[in-house]
């Protein structure tokens, strides 16, 4: 741990003071693509786990600096309690955020994906099952603290954010916190350094998501072609090629880089609803398992149904908005993807009813 943290600090010092790398976005995509491809096929304990562990020090360091900035500067929050349901972050955009329901429940979507993350990575890093309790609950509390810090950062520079001067979420967060810290005497001269470190910390979070998501996408691509209980080692012919871990990783990474280079933001609006569909799937899996082992699963049925309803309503709104206000090819692509997700939601609802309410022989 000491050596790892020391190397991180040394690398940051070198990058900030002597040898910063200025590469194009496409070049960084290729570099990151190579990294996540390697991370996807190597055992968790070799690369993913130690990298996650060392990145956590950046997280805690960032949060400590942010808390010092908030309590030390006593910032005035100039954001109004309510603005409107229209996005004012980009001048003249006129993009509607939609109604409070279901937008609120598909915006706060970060928890849904972790049911999948736990299946392929978290479960391999637990010493015993009970360790999941403090990890899950502690992670939720830390995430809540980070959410409050983010609101404070946005509120502190709201007057600059509204006109469109600072538009990217990462820049908004880093600017707000670094300017708070600049108000504190012993941090007054370190605003640019703190800004860079905050950007680095956020980038490290994104990297943890990328390599884990690539591993999970590779799992799902392989399982798509396999029968229940079958592994890629049992497959033959073209199925053996499609389910090979290296081939599946290449397909996953290439598609990701292609989306990144061609305009992933065009379909990003569907992320929230599609992610909540995964939440419903996770709840269904746990409810089915509890029912199979003879334990009470009723506490999971309502949230599963709620997530399905929220997902379908949000997707229908998205489809309607893109069809009635189609401006380019991407509008129709979003409408088609949204329609497919609605179909998947209905299939999931049918499977859920059959699984949870079927009569025992």
List each language-model region with its residue ranges.
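Hydrophobic, small-residue-rich membrane helices and short re-entrant helix-turn-helix hairpins
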Residues: 42-56, 113-146, 165, 216-217, ...
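Hydrophobic alpha-helical segments of multi-pass membrane transport proteins
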Residues: 36, 59, 206-218, 252-256, ...
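Extracellular/periplasmic helix-exit of transmembrane alpha-helices
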Residues: 70-86, 138-177, 212
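Hydrophobic, membrane-embedded alpha-helices of multi-pass small-molecule transporters
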Residues: 25-42, 68-75, 86-129, 133-138, ...
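Transmembrane helix-loop boundary segments of multi-pass membrane transporters
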Residues: 1, 19-29, 46-55, 161-168, ...
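Loop-to-transmembrane helix boundary motifs in multi-pass membrane proteins
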Residues: 138-145, 190-194, 223-261
């Amino acid at each position: 741990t000491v050596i790892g943290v020391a190397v991180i600090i040394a690398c940051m010092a070198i990058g900030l003071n002597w040898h910063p790398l200025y590469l194009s976005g496409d070049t960084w995509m290729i570099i990151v693509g190579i990294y996540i491809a390697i991370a996807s096929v190597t055992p968790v304990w070799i690369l993913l786990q130690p990298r996650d562990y060392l990145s956590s020090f950046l997280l805690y360091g960032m949060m400590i600096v942010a808390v010092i900035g908030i309590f030390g500067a006593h910032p005035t929050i100039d954001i109004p309690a309510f603005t409107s349901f229209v996005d004012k972050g980009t001048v003249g955009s006129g993009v509607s955020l939609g109604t409070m329901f279901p937008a609120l429940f598909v915006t706060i979507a970060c928890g849904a994906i972790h049911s999948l993350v736990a299946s392929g990575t978290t479960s391999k890093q637990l010493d015993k099952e009970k360790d999941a309790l403090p990890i899950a609950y502690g992670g939720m509390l830390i995430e809540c603290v980070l959410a409050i810090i983010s609101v404070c950062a946005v509120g502190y520079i709201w007057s600059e954010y509204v006109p469109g001067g600072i538009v990217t979420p990462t820049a908004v967060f880093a600017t707000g916190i670094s300017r708070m810290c600049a108000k504190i005497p012993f941090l007054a001269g370190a605003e640019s350094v703190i800004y860079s470190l905050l950007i680095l910390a956020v980038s490290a979070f994104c990297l943890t998501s990328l390599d884990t998501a690539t591993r999970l996408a590779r799992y799902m691509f392989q399982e798509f072609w396999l029968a229940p209980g079958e592994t890629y080692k049992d497959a033959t012919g073209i199925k053996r090629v499609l389910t090979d871990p290296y081939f599946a990783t290449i397909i996953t990474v290439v598609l990701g880089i292609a989306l990144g280079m061609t305009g992933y933001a065009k379909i990003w609006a569907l992320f929230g609803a599609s992610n909540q569909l995964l939440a419903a799937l996770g709840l269904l899996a746990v409810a089915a398992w509890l029912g199979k082992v003879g334990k009470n699963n009723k506490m999971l049925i309502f949230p599963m149904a709620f997530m399905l309803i929220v997902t379908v309503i949000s997707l229908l709104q998205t489809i309607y908005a893109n069809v009635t206000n189609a401006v380019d090819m991407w509008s129709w692509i979003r409408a088609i993807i949204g329609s497919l997700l609605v179909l998947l939601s209905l299939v999931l609802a049918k499977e859920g009813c059959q699984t949870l309410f079927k009569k025992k022989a």
